[in-house]
Amino acid sequence: MSCSRAPVGSRAKRSILPALAAALALAGAACASTQGAPTRADVDTAIRARTASAGIRVDSEPPLPPDVNLGDGLTQDEAVAIALWNSPNFQATLADLGVARADLVEAGLLRNPVFSLLFPWGPKQLEFTLQYPFDLLIQRPARVDAARLNARAVGERLVWDALSLVAQVRTAHADAIAADRRLTLAEENASLTRRLAGIADARLRAGDISDLEARAPQSDAARTDVVHRALRHDRDLARLTLAALLGLDENAAPVQPQLSASYDTAPCVVDDARLKEALASRPDVRAAEIAIEAATARAHWERDRVLALVGILDANGKGDKGFEMGPGVAVDIPLFNRNQGGAARADAEVERASRLYLAARTHVIAEVRSAAARAAQAGQAMDAWTRDIVPSLETEQRQAESAYNAGETALLNVLDVSRRLVDARMQQVDAEADQFRARIALDRAMGRYCR
């Protein structure tokens, strides 16, 4: 019985087909993907859920968010919306998300196969080899998991950066409002002290008081004028600071901060339920938790990097039976180097990530409690000025004006009471600004607006 020999071309095709199938499988596995990585839309949604702001700007959109009009004044909500939309520093921070997504793409890519071709020269026959490191294919799932978790951690940190920016803008807006009100009161106080100095000067010329007695009102008037000029500079500086946080260019109209209903000073009682809510809401805590998972995935990857396995496809043009092709492997025998250093480093990173997570939780609890204490103290101080001190001085002023109209007291006494009332209102403005700042710090510590 005789068997006919298959043509050389048929044997070559049968040998090449498995190699092509393997190559296609590898190509499919190596497709770049960012599945599971957060996008700008995800960050935008998380920010909106915590701040009810206008969201993140896309580069092709105008420099101001929709429904924001600087012509009628700048409210706190508008300032926050503009900052998230337009702040150069925050826009630069958002680029970290693109870097993390690119790292995920790179983690999913596989190494290119190495093709070696030996040309026939003299007695040398034509040969070629195709080599591929299959160990990288085995390590790919752990590598991709680590990169995906890292991208998620970056997304959470970006949300926390946004909340920090919101707190900075709200504080700057509150400071600008307080600076405007201080300047208004300083102008009123300067006018009163000038009138007192004028009365003292008239009494000095009439011989009713001595030169020594007249110097005190004059010095007080000079002092209030200096304070008035300083507060004008403070007002301008507060507005410039706010504009810088908003990322407005030099051609933009000057900001005119406006007090609005968004300045919520209602009490926010912090109990165990609030602490749990803060731990669940804080993006930095969630980022630290995800960092543990990412470090664990990297540890699995490092433990897989022990055995180097290279698949080989060898072919020559003039074997015993003509064209020949066959598989082979090259194995890195782990006698000495089993990636002990990489595995130990990965384990240390897992421990460090765990410690940082515990530190983040401890920090959040302490921050929320201290912010709540400051908010309570600021609220008590504000109540004292609003309910007791300022109303008492207002009553005293009305009584002094009635007595002056009845001819029972001098104008000097009326002006002195008015000046003390202006001073009290100045301190009331400071107390209100402290209350706003304390509430803003509490909102930031909670990871969302405390309602």
Residue map of PLM features:
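Terminal intrinsically disordered/low-complexity segments used for targeting and assembly
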Residues: S2-W85, R232-E277, D443-R451
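Periplasmic alpha-helical coiled-coil/stalk elements that build and connect Gram-negative outer-membrane
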Residues: R14, A32, R140, W160-E277, ...
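Short segments within alpha-helical structural elements
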Residues: R223-N251, L356, A360, E394-R448
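Short, charged, amphipathic alpha-helical segments
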Residues: L94, D145-R148, D211-S219, L411-R419
